[in-house]
């Protein structure tokens, strides 16, 4: 009689947060480029930036300003949207309001909770 051993290997995806952090890192280091004459190489617009590698994120056109409405892209802008005054992230008022300022409103809401004792 013989014994049999079973070995299973698999690849595991990183957490969603890890993937997001890596993408954000690529985004923050993205380089604006133009095409070379041969069409095979990319040339950074900023001469002080190193030549991008195959793993670098590059772009060729600036994004429109998401602060203002833009019919062509379908962006409604950020004016009138709710923001988080305590957040320093993209949902925070300092970033979302694009320097226009914002009004902070403190509201009290009373509801019947239908509590029973």
Swiss-Prot record:
InterPro entries: Wnt, Wnt_C. Keywords: Developmental protein, Disulfide bond, Extracellular matrix, Glycoprotein, Lipoprotein, Secreted, Wnt signaling pathway. The keyword Ubl conjugation does not apply. It comes from Strongylocentrotus purpuratus. Disulfide bonds join 83-98. This is Protein Wnt-6. Belongs to the Wnt family. It is found in: Secreted, Extracellular space, Extracellular matrix. Its main location: secreted. The lineage of its organism: Eukaryota, Metazoa, Echinodermata, Eleutherozoa, Echinozoa.
